[in-house]
């Protein structure tokens, strides 16, 4: 891994010796810059525009070269607002790609796409930096071991387990709980595994970014008293940023995660919320650069852009990056090119269902639509596999019977089917769980349920031992013992 040992002071002095160009055209966030003959910058080089606007305010805009147009002109995309820029302004070619701080100094801090801290906590140690554009690890460096990553969330661990060092997609429309699930995972992983996380906020709401930061400070994931003890680094490029920043902020977060994996040899969790916004920003940039759009108006380079990001997220013999990516599904259409391209890279999918959210079952993870390549007997063991398959069969049968129930009612079902429906409704409710990060909304304390406890609970429901308990006893509880205790309380209240 190439590390650039630069300090901010020396970076400026080396810039002075580089070649200068001038702005020839500005169209929103896209700049055309003319350079002297023979002094053209390379693709992905960072350009710096410095100067003053009409009211004398200092301007410092960093752009990234995207196209070489010929006639000594390059087209670059700005990483911040282009307000105040004028034609004829001087542009410096840095001679290298964007580099961002990496290592322990990033923990507990919030950065923008350029690796600049935006949390008003003072400067960050920039002695160790790394370029955001790097090639994926070679095949020979990759680690091929298969092991489960326990999350403490029942529905995930039982039916669609995550792979350590794998890529997981969180699919769902607006408002079904993707961000809450991500916050719970960060919380559980920091507490149960002591792992380092990097959170990339790509094109989402600034308010959510702020809420997440406050939540992390409250839960101790970010340690305010001793910032170096924190377990997460945050990189934000929010909805109000230009498309260039939203397109590159994922790479900034990934670069920080790669350092923890390759140099510190740690297991890292990389959260990207939302990978769809990465595609959306790429689509905006593609249109601004004048490329012909592809299906549904997306960029023609959609698969290439997605592949270059996803192939860097992998496990090597040094360490692993387990990535959890929220995927917004436009109009709940899973065949849209953005989610469809993302599917190709994933080891597991956690699909959130609006129907379950409407029933009040949280996390609203669809047990039949969510999948995992890890759910095989040779990986998870026979007991886990059998239990998961029986749970799915019971829920599938219930789904098939729902039309009959809606038209004819429960009484028209056979005795066996009525039993299946009763157990399926208990399973459906037992798949819900109180979250630590949602304690303020639900009023019930969060629960972390180990995999062995989860399997035991569902085996008891399937065996029929708990057929006599009311189904509401299984709603929003942790392990099965809590459900039986809740049933006794409900009985006591009736008397």
Swiss-Prot record:
InterPro entries: AAA+_ATPase, ATP-synt_VA_C, ATP_synth_F1_bsu, ATPase_a/bsu_AS, ATPase_alpha/beta_chains, ATPase_F1/V1/A1_a/bsu_N, ATPase_F1/V1/A1_a/bsu_N_sf, ATPase_F1/V1/A1_a/bsu_nucl-bd
The protein's role, per its UniProt record: Produces ATP from ADP in the presence of a proton gradient across the membrane. The catalytic sites are hosted primarily by the beta subunits.
Pfam family, any one: ATP-synt_ab_N
Record GO cellular component, one term: proton-transporting ATP synthase complex
Lineage, uppermost ranks: Eukaryota, Viridiplantae, Streptophyta, Embryophyta, Tracheophyta
Chief localisation class: plastid
Residues holding ATP: 172-179
Binding partners and assembly: F-type ATPases have 2 components, CF(1) - the catalytic core - and CF(0) - the membrane proton channel. CF(1) has five subunits: alpha(3), beta(3), gamma(1), delta(1), epsilon(1). CF(0) has four main subunits: a(1), b(1), b'(1) and c(9-12).
Keywords in alphabetical order: ATP synthesis, ATP-binding, CF(1), Chloroplast, Hydrogen ion transport, Ion transport, Membrane, Nucleotide-binding, Plastid, Thylakoid, Translocase, Transport
GO molecular function: ATP binding; ATP hydrolysis activity; proton-transporting ATP synthase activity, rotational mechanism
EC number per UniProt: 7.1.2.2
Effect ascribed to mutating residue 92 to I: In strain: cv. H599
Official protein name in the record: ATP synthase subunit beta, chloroplastic
Domain of life, per lineage: Eukaryota
Cellular compartments annotated: Plastid, Chloroplast thylakoid membrane
Broadest EC class assigned to this enzyme: translocase
């Amino acid at each position: 891994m190439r590390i650039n040992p630069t300090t901010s002071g020396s970076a400026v002095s080396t810039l002075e010796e580089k070649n200068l160009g001038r702005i020839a055209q500005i169209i929103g966030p896209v700049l055309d810059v003319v350079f002297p003959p023979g002094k053209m910058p390379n693709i992905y080089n960072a350009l710096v525009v410095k100067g003053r606007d009409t009211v004398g305010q200092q301007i410092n805009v960093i752009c990234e070269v995207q196209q070489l147009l010929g006639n000594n002109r390059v087209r670059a995309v700005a990483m911040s607002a282009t307000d105040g820029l004028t034609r004829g302004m001087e542009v410096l070619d840095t001679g290298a790609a964007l580099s961002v701080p990496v290592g322990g100094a990033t923990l507990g801090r919030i950065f923008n796409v350029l690796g600049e801290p935006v949390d008003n906590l003072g400067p960050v140690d920039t002695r160790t930096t790394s370029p955001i554009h790097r090639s994926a690890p070679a095949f020979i460096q990759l680690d091929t071991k298969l092991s489960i990553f326990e999350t403490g969330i029942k529905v995930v661990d039982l039916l669609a387990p995550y792979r350590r060092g794998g890529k997981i997609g969180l699919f769902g429309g607006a408002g079904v709980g993707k961000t809450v699930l991500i916050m719970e995972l960060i919380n559980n992983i920091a507490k149960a595994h002591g792992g380092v996380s990097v959170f990339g906020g790509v094109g989402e709401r600034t308010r959510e970014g702020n809420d997440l930061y406050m939540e992390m400070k409250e839960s101790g994931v970010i340690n305010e008293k001793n910032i170096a003890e924190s377990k997460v680094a945050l990189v934000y490029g929010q909805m109000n940023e230009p498309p260039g920043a939203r397109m590159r902020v994922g790479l900034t977060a990934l670069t920080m995660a790669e350092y923890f994996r390759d140099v510190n040899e740690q297991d890292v969790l990389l959260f990207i919320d939302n990978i769809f916004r990465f595609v959306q920003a790429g689509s905006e940039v593609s249109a601004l650069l004048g490329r012909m759009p592809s299906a549904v108006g997306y960029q023609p380079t959609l698969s290439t852009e997605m592949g270059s990001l996803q192939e860097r997220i992998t496990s090597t013999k040094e360490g692993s990056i387990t990535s959890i990516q929220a995927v917004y599904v436009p109009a709940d259409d899973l065949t849209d090119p953005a989610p469809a391209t993302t599917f190709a890279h994933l080891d597991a999918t956690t699909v959130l269902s609006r129907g379950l959210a409407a029933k009040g079952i949280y996390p609203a993870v669809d047990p039949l639509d969510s999948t995992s390549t890890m759910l095989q007997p040779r990986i998870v063991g026979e007991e886990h596999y059998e239990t998961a398959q029986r749970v799915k069969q019971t829920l599938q049968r219930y789904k098939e019977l729902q039309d009959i129930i809606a038209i004819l009612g429960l009484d028209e079902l056979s005795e066996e089917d009525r039993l299946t429906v009763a157990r399926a409704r208990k399973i459906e409710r037992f798949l819900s769980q109180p979250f630590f990060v949602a304690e303020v909304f639900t009023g019930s304390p969060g629960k972390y349920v180990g995999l062995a406890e989860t399997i035991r609970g569902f085996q008891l429901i399937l065996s029929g031992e708990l057929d006599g308990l009311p189904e509401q006893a299984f709603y929003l509880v942790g392990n099965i013992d809590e459900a039986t205790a809740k049933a006794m309380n409900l009985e006591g209240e009736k008397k």
